[in-house]
Amino acid sequence: MSFGFPTFSQNRFTEQYSGLCPIAPGRGAGLQPCRRDCPVARWLVADHPVFGSDCRCRMMVGVNRVRIGRHELTGA
């Protein structure tokens, strides 16, 4: 299913921080993983290098645009 968002290969920012995503673990050294299972691979979770640890989840919608808050589909 496609949600119309950039894939990891299309989004350099997402690739850089893909270790934060539960689907692509292991590359975000020092960042805490999210405990939720998100069905959308574009979610980055836990500490964000810009916004800090108060931001629990965010969805990448562009190279430098970060949407912060609840998941539009699951409400998580």
From Swiss-Prot:
Key words, A-Z: Acyltransferase, Host cytoplasm, Host nucleus, Secreted, Transferase
Activity-regulation annotation: Is completely inhibited by anacardic acid, an inhibitor of HAT activity.
Any one GO BP annotation for this protein: symbiont-mediated perturbation of host cellular process
EC number: 2.3.1.48
A GO molecular-function descriptor: chromatin binding
Induction info: Expression of this gene marginally increases (1.5-fold) in macrophages from 12 to 24 hours post-infection, and does not decrease up to 60 h.
Keyword Transferase: yes
Gene Ontology CC annotation, any one: host cell cytoplasm
Subcellular location: Secreted; Host cytoplasm; Host nucleus
Domain of life, per lineage: Bacteria
Primary localization class, coarse: secreted
Catalytic function, reaction form: L-lysyl-[protein] + acetyl-CoA = N(6)-acetyl-L-lysyl-[protein] + CoA + H(+)
Function: Histone acetyltransferase, which by binding to the host chromatin, may manipulate the expression of host genes involved in anti-inflammatory responses to evade clearance and to survive in the intracellular milieu. Acetylates histone H3 at the 'Lys-9' and 'Lys-14' positions.
Subunit-structure text: Physically interacts with histone H3 in infected macrophages.
Other remarks on this protein: On the 2D-gel the determined pI of this protein is: 9.47.
Protein name from the UniProt record: Histone acetyltransferase
Source organism of the structure: Mycobacterium tuberculosis (strain ATCC 25618 / H37Rv)
